[in-house]
Amino acid sequence: MSDLSHIRNFSIIAHIDHGKSTLADRFIQMCGGLAEREMEAQVLDSMDLERERGITIKAHSVTLYYTAKDGIKYQLNFIDTPGHVDFTYEVSRSLAACEGALLVVDAGQGVEAQSVANCYTAIEQGLEVMPVLNKIDLPQADPDRVKEEIEKIIGIDATDAVECSAKTGLGVDEVLERLVKTIPAPTGNYEDPLQALIIDSWFDNYLGVVSLVRVRHGRVKKGDKILVKSTGKIHLVDSVGVFNPKHTATTDLKAGEVGFIIAGIKDIHGAPVGDTLTLSSTPDVDVLPGFKRIQPQVYAGLFPVSSDDFEDFREALQKLTLNDSSLQYTPESSDALGFGFRCGFLGMLHMEIIQERLEREYDLDLITTAPTVIFELALKTGETIYVDNPSKLPDLSSIEDMREPIVRANILVPQEHLGNVITLCIEKRGVQHDMLFLGTQVQVTYDLPMNEVVLDFFDRLKSTSRGYASLDYHFDRYQSANLVKLDVLINGDKVDALALIVHKDNAHYKGRQLTEKMKELIPRQMFDVAIQAAIGGQIIARTSVKALRKNVLAKCYGGDVSRKRKLLEKQKAGKKRMKQVGNVEIPQEAFLAVLRLDS
């Protein structure tokens, strides 16, 4: 398709479960992207994990051809985006390739915090946002209330928002009609030198690196020599094409289009996401503004159960980072667990997903340590350092001040659950910043310590509000706090992988809880196992896993008490000797016991 005015690039912004992937299925069906027999629910969620959890993790792209009612054939390039708070970076990447976005809102549930955050990102990037009310067929749908909410909370006009039901297909054609009228056509020139933005890359064992690109200017075809701006390397293009939704090769990709380029790049870091591609004959083309690199919020150690898997693990991480640019990792070693990597994630869900992908796609057995956030330390020497691993914390006598990261959290909650949410925020050491009443919903803004938010805040928020509250947060600042390092000792030996940094007020409580939890998880040995929690040299909690013991008196049948005592003493001496040389196997669950502490 040659005419730029007939191309529309758009993505869908929606909260989890508001029907985004189902609407995408309807678009594909209506535009004849797949035959009836190939249609399945959530076509674009191609990862098994995405289907099981019912969430979109990666951004996907599809090119569809839609003939409008006025007879014009439009090329729709649709980039699917995730809705969960941990994957906002995927959203900003997708939006960088679009001119417009559909804001899909569940007509029963109304606006949720995550859609608000993503919608603002779209507006900041200058996109045209078009509201769509989905699930209009449900009995609890209340379109008028939701339209009012969109106007009040997000501030865009929703009086004539399109109403549809992606599940039944009702009104979906109207969405497409409105879309081609509302969303602007891309700008660009075929004759200019090639300038293309890499939106996503992934590694294919046969093809090498496959890059999803948005062409801004010029054109690219098979046989062209392309230059990757950041690495300065030149590659020969093997094939170009689009997804509709299957891989379909085309003769070329032109300005305004979104598609894939395969150039036989074997180096995993050969085509970084957010980079600019151009032809080798025009190397002085300007670099396109990429998207801001997202800093990880949560760090955890990942260790292979068998040390022989270390190299495979390194390779698997390299391949995953290509596809998921927000994952960061550095090698680390632990006395308890051997060699592994310290990985940075965007949140707890992201961490779980990465661990599952490593175990499934690369067949690895991993142990994960408890996640922590980054702390800022002002040392007495005057320098400032950042620590993401409790076992790397310097001696307390050399620290002038410890600061913890604070996030600004926006919570949208129905009025009847407001009390529970406020109680939860206070329990998590939150400070209220603002409260707005918007129709039946309330928007509360809290400053919360990130350490409290990343572990289980999201789950607790959902359960206290019966699933109705929604959360969006971003890092705000570092703030001084009275923090201490909580060590766990097993039989008198510190286990570095179990150390935690906690607030002093909670330390005794956390220590008691942690030792009790460990007692349940560590299996009984042939000798007593002492589990202690300590701050510095002071033991604040202790519990023991009692030894398994054989009844040595069974053969005595009455007999003299001194004979019995002799047998018991002999057993005791044996147990003592075992304890000195015995090793305690700590199961994987014990390393994650920290996550299951009720804060």
Swiss-Prot record:
Reaction catalysis annotation: GTP + H2O = GDP + phosphate + H(+)
Keyword Lipid biosynthesis: no
Major location (coarse): membrane
Xref: PROSITE patterns: G_TR_2
Domain tr-type G: 5-187
Membrane topology recorded in Swiss-Prot or TrEMBL: Peripheral membrane protein
GO CC field: plasma membrane
GO biological process, one term: positive regulation of translation
Domain of life: Bacteria
Its EC number(s): 3.6.5.n1
Molecular-function GO terms, alphabetical: GTP binding; GTPase activity; guanosine tetraphosphate binding; ribosome binding; translation elongation factor activity
Name of the top EC class for this enzyme: hydrolase
Residues involved in GTP binding: 17-22, 134-137
Keyword Transferase recorded: no
Keywords assigned: Cell inner membrane, Cell membrane, GTP-binding, Hydrolase, Membrane, Nucleotide-binding, Protein biosynthesis
Cellular localisation: Cell inner membrane
Family that this chain belongs to: Belongs to the TRAFAC class translation factor GTPase superfamily. Classic translation factor GTPase family. LepA subfamily.
Protein purpose: Required for accurate and efficient protein synthesis under certain stress conditions. May act as a fidelity factor of the translation reaction, by catalyzing a one-codon backward translocation of tRNAs on improperly translocated ribosomes. Back-translocation proceeds from a post-translocation (POST) complex to a pre-translocation (PRE) complex, thus giving elongation factor G a second chance to translocate the tRNAs correctly. Binds to ribosomes in a GTP-dependent manner.
Record-given protein name: Elongation factor 4
Organism listed in the record: Pseudomonas fluorescens (strain SBW25)
Lineage: Bacteria, Pseudomonadati, Pseudomonadota, Gammaproteobacteria, Pseudomonadales
GN (gene name): lepA
